[in-house]
Curated annotation (Swiss-Prot):
Lineage: Bacteria, Bacillati, Bacillota, Bacilli, Lactobacillales
NCBIfam families hit by this protein: dnan
Record-given protein name: Beta sliding clamp
Subcellular location: Cytoplasm
The family this protein is said to belong to: Belongs to the beta sliding clamp family.
SMART domains attached to this UniProt entry: POL3Bc
Gene: dnaN
Organism: Streptococcus pneumoniae (strain ATCC BAA-255 / R6)
GO MF annotation: an example: 3'-5' exonuclease activity
Annotated GO CC locations: cytoplasm; DNA polymerase III complex
Length: 378
């Protein structure tokens, strides 16, 4: 029969992290619960939605937790309801006691709340991942890679493989990450400091965004373990499991052009603001596009909406080389790409009005490239 006391605020923080893996609308009702597992070492909170699972460990050695364990055990509690109850408690200390099989009393200050739980044996087991040699990355670096690529993944389930980000490690240290929804593509390459075993996996972009929310910047490094159909990201206290997407990711290398006819360097903030102004009107047009015109070294953006009005704006540039060109595209794709850049300047290179164009940071030596497909207009 479980009995422990803990700092309420730290417990609530840990519950909210674990809750990110829990869906109240799950087809499997037991997955709307949080599993609380109490051992001599500490308290583990477990949540899962079948796609991702989070185990969050609060150690007895963590002084901030003020954790006192009297007796051990495990129980399931309805996650959202339990978290609301805990957050409403008046005092900074919370006493958690199982009074009879799967029934608990929470005591805090002068408040005492009794809750019914469920037998923890009903909870599905998380597949073990063998602790082979992990890939170790800085958390900030991995989150940066996710920020630079995951947005370009598809949100359509018609081609499930494209809803993921393709991570490939070759020659033991060359990491390439790619995401595409077939209208745009984002690719980041870098060389790791330490050798690791090669891998080729497709991780759901939704899982990666959750990873970024769960692993805060104060967690310095993350260990990554691979199994047949899932991957584990682990820090000292958090284990984050996600299923991998099955199937072969398309060969994206052949999509990336190398020769261009027109190249322009822009200030990222200026270009983004211009595109956001253009998008206000383009969203009211039939095809939602903005037309970019490059003529005699001058670059201008145009949108014409019969219902709303029009935009004509000359855009400041740092450098323009090559041929004149008129090209139309979805401004949201360009805005998203510019948001993912960590540079002040961007170089955009064009081949023709109907071929994809590329964006690369102009003032850093990062190997980061994005591709956007234009829209054919009359």
């Amino acid at each position: 029969m479980i009995h422990f006391s803990i700092n309420k605020n730290l417990f609530l923080q840990a519950l909210n992290i674990t809750k990110r893996a829990i869906s109240s609308k799950n087809a499997i009702p037991i997955l709307s619960t949080v599993k609380i597992d109490v051992t001599n070492e500490g308290v583990t909170l477990i949540g899962s939605n079948g796609q991702i699972s989070i185990e969050n460990f609060i150690s007895q050695k963590n002084e901030d937790a003020g954790l006192l364990i009297t007796s051990l055990g495990s129980i399931l509690l309805e996650a959202s309801f339990f978290i609301n109850v805990v957050s409403s408690l008046p005092d900074v200390t919370l006493d958690f006691k199982e009074i009879e099989q799967n029934q608990i009393v929470l005591t805090s200050g002068k408040s005492e709340i009794t809750l019914k739980g469920k037998d923890s044996e009903q909870y599905p087991r998380i597949q073990e991942i063998s602790a082979s040699t992990p890939l170790i990355l800085e958390t900030k670096l991995l989150k940066k890679i996710i920020n630079e690529t995951a947005f370009a993944a598809s949100t359509q389930e018609s081609r499930p493989i494209l809803t993921g980000v393709h991570f490939v490690l070759s020659q033991h240290k060359e990491l390439k990450t790619v995401a595409t929804d077939s209208h745009r593509l984002s690719q980041k390459k870098l060389t790791l400091e330490k050798n690791s075993d090669d891998f080729d996996v497709v991780i759901p972009s939704r899982s990666l965004r959750e990873f970024s929310a769960v692993f805060t910047d104060d967690i310095e490094t993350v260990e990554i373990f691979f199994a047949n159909n899932q991957i584990l990201f682990r820090s000292e206290n958090i284990s984050f499991y996600t299923r991998l997407l099955e199937g072969n990711y398309p060969d994206t290398d052949r999509l990336i052009p190398t020769d261009f006819n027109t190249t322009i360097t822009f200030n990222v903030v200026n270009l983004r603001q211009s595109m956001e102004r253009a998008r206000l009107l383009s969203s009211a047009t039939q095809n939602g596009t903005v037309k970019l015109e490059i003529k005699d070294g001058v670059v201008s953006a145009h949108v014409h909406s019969p219902e709303v009005g029009k935009v004509n704006e000359e855009i400041d540039t740092d450098q323009v080389t090559g041929e004149d060109l008129t090209i139309s595209f979805n401004p949201t794709y360009l805005i998203d790409s510019l948001k993912a850049l960590n540079s002040e300047k961007v170089t955009i290179s064009f081949i023709s009005a109907v071929r994809p164009f590329t964006l690369v940071p102009a003032d850093t030596d990062e190997d980061f490239m994005q591709l956007i497909t234009p829209v054919r207009t009359n």
